[in-house]
Amino acid sequence: MGAGQSTTTTEGRSSPEEMSHLLAQRFASKCFTPLELTHLEDNFNSQALDEHGLRYWNEEILSRFLGIPDGAGEKASPQTDATLDAGPVLFRMVSYLGAFPFHNTLAPSVLTYDAIVKVIVLLTERYGRVLKRGRKDRMKLLFGSLADVGRTQTEKQRETSQVDTKMSSDEAYSTDGASSNITGFSIDAPANDGEEEDDDDDLALAALESLDAIEVFKHDQRLDRSVYKARISVSTFRRLLALLLVIAPLHPMGRRQMIQTDAESIDAVQPSWIASCSLGDEANGDGHYLSDFSRVITTSLPFLFDPLTPLFEHFLFSKNLDLSKRKDSHQSHEESNSPSPPPSPHLECVFLPGHFETNILNSAILSHLSFFLSTSYPIPNLFRNQTRLHPVFSSDFHGESLTAFSHHVLTWHAPSLLLLKGVTGSSSSKQETVLAGAYLPEPWKRSTSPLSTPMSDFLDTSRFPCLFQLLPTHTVLQAAPAFKSLKSNMPVVSFSTNSGIAVGCMIPPSSRTSLNNELQPRPSGGGSLIIDPALENATFYVSDGLHGDGVFLPPGLSPSSSLSLSASATSSTMSISIHSIEVWGVVPTPAELDANLDPNSPKDAISMQKAMWDFEAREAERRKTIHLNVGGGDSEAQTGRALLEMAGIIGDSQYSPRRR
């Protein structure tokens, strides 16, 4: 292993091992408080193995400490759920990251104290305190820690005699003692393929510059990839997604035991991610290469790795040093040994109480949404920023009526989340479940009212709308940078009793000839969603977006990316037979409300909605006193009252829950 290599060099300069130790010391002194280091040292030393004076952790200890499912491998049973067998994947990651920045020489590293310090700093993004020039983006580093290496079929036939000369990283670590013929992960093997070098090594370069050891780094990083093609296999990616889905709601002080996520929900979500990432067929050995991995994560799942931060911050809290346990010296031994950190939030902590129970959202879907939706600034992740969801409208409870929709949704003056679930409308092929929606940062308005958010909020991604599809494939259409400066006939969302609900569409201007027959919205830009007035059918459009401007960018593009990135090559139209529509209000966090200096912004959307409903109720009562006996007869009065009821001015029958 890398740890067993010589610590001297023929040229007399510092070896990678020495520089790695020095970097770990600098990380420890600059990136942690003394109290955090005390807890970290206690956690490590209390469970470390000792072999010839070398203290380290193995995969079993790491999985047990973090509460990671680790039921496959040698201990697998017929009842084992291999989907949640994330222990080997996580151990491979930390073994690679522990060798930072000398992955070619030292990886896979033994999980010593120095290695764990570097892993925590990298996965919690604390390195900015030391590496001022280092990139915030860890994409290449994370890819390297997850990548498997495969050969083409031609290479396998030509080099069958040399297949066993390279040990896998897991086999290398499982052998006793150090091995002198291991040079690191195969992802870093030299090969001279003539490809254009990827100079996305700012993080590693910054680390070595801080130690004045660039020459050591250059000696270690002679990379080439013609023989070995680095990729993340379908199996590895599948287990990674399952792990991230489960730990998404985890808080740093939460219990490390895995949240009981519905396995069926995970199985339903994962295939859409696999399809969107173009991982290919697992049986044929296809995998996910760096370019695709970087594109998909950047544009479609920008917060995918956020759950790793609170997971590894558990190292900074030791229950053995919990001072709260010493307040009562008379506590029983059982009570003193009980874990003190509070549990991580479940769905009931995210959802506010309301009139209906969701038929769309579950733990896996909510975790899925947290990987790309930005609901606050500067902390975008909805689990980290304490965002709460308030039930606003449900077609299952309030009825499939635009009148009921407008009564509940148009009175909500805060960001909202529109979700619809149904099946594909094509009868010629097998129907598939469809789950689509949109994040709308502005309150709903009738027709085409202009947006009120100023253009100065460009860095605040929570002010940008987002159109997405979660099933049967994962597709995210982010807002165009100039969506707020589009013409008034191209609003983010349009609501009309004649044309229905339109998201990201161009609304034709009204004219005398169309007063009684309003023109239908037209798709524009990279994608649009149109729901008919009956709330029974919808159409989801995705296009290359190059034919005209629009609210949303094509798939594969983000507001900060250049147009040279690969976007969707073809246009597609999906007809959806709607089963359920839900609208959830996004309640701002307390910190966001305190920092909000806009006097016109709603301080409490729930109270404002209730006040508007109370006003409508008073107006309805007042209209009941209108003298309807215009013709002097009871029949005319009954006719007038019936007209008012049909118009929705009096009476509440149109808002009553639909009976099923």
UniProtKB/Swiss-Prot annotation:
Subcellular location: Cytoplasm
Keyword hit for Cytoplasm: yes
GO CC aspect terms: cytoplasm
PROSITE patterns, per database record: TLDC (PS51886)
Residue span(s) of domain TLDc: 359-587
InterPro entries xrefs: TLDc_dom (IPR006571)
Domain of life: Eukaryota
Keyword field contains Protease: no
Principal subcellular localization: cytoplasm
UniProt region (Disordered), positions on chain: 153-199
Pfam families per record: TLD
Keywords of the record: Cytoplasm
Family: Belongs to the RTC5 family.
Known role: May be involved in a process influencing telomere capping.
Protein name: Restriction of telomere capping protein 5
Record organism: Uncinocarpus reesii (strain UAMH 1704)
